[in-house]
Amino acid sequence: ALLERLAHQLRRLLGDSLFWAGMPRFLVDNAYHPVTTPDYAAAMEQTCHCDLDWFFDQWAYGIGYPRVAFARHWDAAAKTLHVTVTQTQPVDSVHPLFRFPVTLRVITRDSVVRREIMVSRASETFAVALPAEPLSFRFDEGGWLLGTVAGDYSEAELATMAAHDLDVRGRDWAVLALTAIGMVL
């Protein structure tokens, strides 16, 4: 299951076209002999023409996983949603900070706004310009992140997300979050 999640994270990072272009290269280059993680990494790096050492260092060879907490603040005057993302897992020489992409999805009265961010620090704030006040917010749209996420959702927001989120992973996550705080659906 861990290798599946690693591939899932890599697909999120590279995108479908590069990820799926790398798979045949890996299979053809390594046909009929044992393979290792560096063989997989080399095939994917050759396909995307990028250095993925940092990715494999944290997801394949590293210890642990990211634990993320976020807090939001709506600045009505600037029409900007500020999202502070904090990595809460233990960080030391053996457990470094993680680096990972995340999609923020915000629904307003008239639009759906998606913003791609790259989380790489212990705590950082991202500004998302919006046409109007946010009605719904989703951190990690699609549920790609291999880690845990906690946020400043109210019970009402979680209940709305559980019933009406745009994807099943969001609805499932909201139900689990409601269960964790003792809400019964």
Per-range role (PLM):
Residues 1-5, 119-121, 144:
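Residue-level recognition of alpha-helix boundary/capping or hinge positions
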Residues 1-83:
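Amphipathic alpha-helical substructures
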Residues 35, 164-173:
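Generic helix N-cap/helix-start motif at coil->alpha-helix transitions
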Residues 52-53, 63-141:
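Beta-strand-rich binding/interaction modules
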Residues 141-152:
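Short acidic/polar inter-strand loop motif in beta-rich domains
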Residues 151-162, 184-185:
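Amphipathic alpha-helical scaffolding segments comprising HEAT/armadillo-like alpha-solenoid repeats
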Residues 162-163, 179:
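Ankyrin-repeat helical core positions
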Residues 169-183:
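Structural detector for internal amphipathic alpha-helices that build alpha-solenoid repeat scaffolds
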